[in-house]
Each structure stands twice: as structure tokens, then as C-alpha cells.
Amino acid sequence: MSDTSKTNLSEQLFAPRMNTKETSNLVKIANLKSASVHNALDGDSESGWYRVLRRPQWIWQGIDPIEMEAILSRMASSTATRTSDELLDTVIGYKPGNWIYEWTQVGAKLQKKARAYVEAGQKEKAADTLLKASMYYSVAAYPHLKGDTLAAQAEIQANQSYRESMALTPHQIRTIDVKYEGKTFQAFIHLPRTDKLLPTVIVSGGLDSLQSDLWRLYRDYFGPAGFAMVTLDMPSVGHSSRWALTEDTSRLHQALVQQIRDVPWVDNTKVAMLGLRFGANAAIRLGFMEPTRLKTCISLGGAIHSMLTQPTMLDSMPRMYLDVIASRMGKHGVSKSSLTSHLPAWSLKNQGLLGRRKVDVPMLGISLKNDPVCREIDNQLIEKSSRGGKAITLPDTPLHDGYHRSMVTVIEWLKDKLA
């Protein structure tokens, strides 16, 4: 794509529009009070912010911490009209002080910098810079609520930057077009080498992230361990946005695992799945749906049963997370009680999968102590419902490296099961 066309795309996407709804005003669950969260997987909810600020994860993904604080500071000091005067990140319209505006401005600067690197023949620097641009655009779109017009435009830029980086990176990255229900969604496969068949890990994140956010998992963990990594978005998110989230959380993953046999480089006898948060619900479910195609399934802080069946646990969730769940389910303007009445159907225990029979796929349930989403009993359900299963609860301190400690444990498990 030429520089001019890229510029035109950005200008076209973010051209001023009337009546663009601000993110926090999209779902509007009735009579809802927000709670706080503070943990390694989700980040921190802070007074005065609608969004949960995922500082440690964003830094880990490649966001510059000084730049991040400057962005947040510009939002905080803005005098523009807000949806809620008490919430700093609710400036209305694509203008200075607006969450999406501030993050996309930095993403655009990085895109321009990357083009300069390309012209100078510095492809590796250009690839790294484009990956960073993709992360800034993804944070701009966070938490990826359906119907958020500006966020959808930021997602387009995130995907564009990620695709451009793929063409330049020394790593081997390809797209996989997966057909399902007469439509197609895209997954990405990341390859440490292409001269042999590789053990492969399918990965899905939560409901508030894009598959491009998972790049660091490949670079720091799967790639060095010799695993190929295949990512896909959860239903209703990113490349999978044309499918609503239903209690059949694993249906897109099932379509992928059924078609992955046709993908070069993948050792079909050594395929695993890892899911984070709601992605873990899909991962464990897939183990029951496709036990002959998977060697192991892993839940990292998964929304498996407890959170979905105990309304009191949702009382400890920030409003943003409840908005995300409601958005994925297509529930707008409903009461909290109406929302929670639908969630038990997502419980893998209520679906008759966990706690009733053992599947031959060894499964790992892992979380940090005091996890607000995944209780120890959830991991124990996973352990008891699979032959060779295991439940692990890691210390929740130090907070900043909880993600790393979890992934080290995951890699050790995969090396054993995919040997």
C-alpha cells in the first residue's frame, strides 16, 4: 500500500462524524454500580476511569510506559465535554482528550516512522515499529465494544499495521482463512521454522482483546520453545466479529481445528489449545468437542463456572467488564439481573461437560491466587474432568510478573504433553 493510500485510509476512517457515540455510553446496563479490580491478568480499575487500565500488560505488549502516562495525562487534563464528568476517559467525539483519539495519534506517528525505516532499507526496525503501532491502535479500540464506530476504525488500523509488519518481520507469519457457516474468518499462524512439521498451540484471549495482542506470547514463549502458534479472535471480536458470542464458545475454534490438517507446517498429531479468560472457556470446551484432535487444553484464569453462576462474583467486577459481556451477548440497556440470568448457560459444568465424566485429553487449569474470575474450584473441576489433568494456583505476588510465571508453567506443561 502506498504512503498516500495509507494516509487517505487514516483520514477516511477517522474523519469527523456527527452523533458518534462515546464508548462508555454504548451498553448502559441499568442501575449498575462499578466495583474495582487489581490483578496481573486484568490490570487495575482506578477511580475516575471507565476503562480498566492494564498498564503491566500494555507495557509487556510493547507500549512505552512514559508515552502511556503522557496519553493518560492528556485525557485527564482535557476540558472537553464528557459523557460522565467523573470519568476522565469519556470525552465525546474524536478530538484531543478522547481515548481513541489520543492512542491513535501515537499509532499514526509510529506508522509514519516505520515507513521511513522501510525507505531506508531497515526492514527489521520497520517491522518492530509497525508491531508497536498495532498495539497502540488496539489499545485505542479497547475494550472493543460492538457498535463503537471509532473503535472499529482503530481495529482496522491495528490489523493493517500488523499485516504490514508480517511482510517485513524475520519471523514466518501467515494467515489462515477458515470457512464456517458460509463465511470466512482469519487466523494467524506464527512459525519459528518452516523446514519441518511443528507442534502447534491454538491461542485465544479474552473478550476485550484482539488476536494481534498475543504476539508477545509467540516471541517470548512459544517460538523459543519450538512451537507454532495459531491465534484467532473470540466470537464477536475482531476478525470473528460476524459471529455473536453464544454458550457454544468454541464453535469457531472447532472449525479451525477441523481445518488445520490442511495447513502446511502443522503436526496434526501434536495440537494443543490455550485460552485466557473467556478464551479458556472455549479451550476447555473444545477438549470435550474434539478429544481426538487435541493433545492437551489449558485454561489460564478461565471463566469456567463460578463467575458465570454466582451473581455475587459479578458484584466485584468493574462496570467495563460487565459492559463487555453484555456487548458480546448483544444485551444493551438491560438490567444487571437480566444479564446475569443468561450467564449460567455459559458454565461448562451446567453444560454437562465438567464434573460428570472424564475426557481423555489431559487438561491444565491454572490461575493466580485470589483471581476474581477463576476460583480454585474451577481449576479443580478441570483437573477432575480430564485424565491426567492438573490444577495449579500460583502466588499472586509479585503482581507485575504474574503473566510471566503463568506462561513459564504453561510452556513446561506443553513440552511434556507435545513431546
From Swiss-Prot:
Entry EC number(s): 3.1.1.1
A Pfam family matched in the record: FrsA-like
UniProt keyword terms in alphabetical order: Hydrolase, Serine esterase
InterPro entries, A to Z: AB_hydrolase_fold, FrsA, FrsA-like, FrsA_esterase
Keyword field contains Lipid metabolism: no
Domain of life: Bacteria
GO molecular function list: carboxylesterase activity
Matches recorded under NCBIfam families: PRK05077.1
PANTHER family with a match to the protein in the record: DIENELACTONE HYDROLASE DOMAIN-CONTAINING PROTEIN-RELATED, ESTERASE FRSA
Protein name from the UniProt record: Esterase FrsA
Source organism per UniProt: Photobacterium profundum (strain SS9)
Gene: frsA
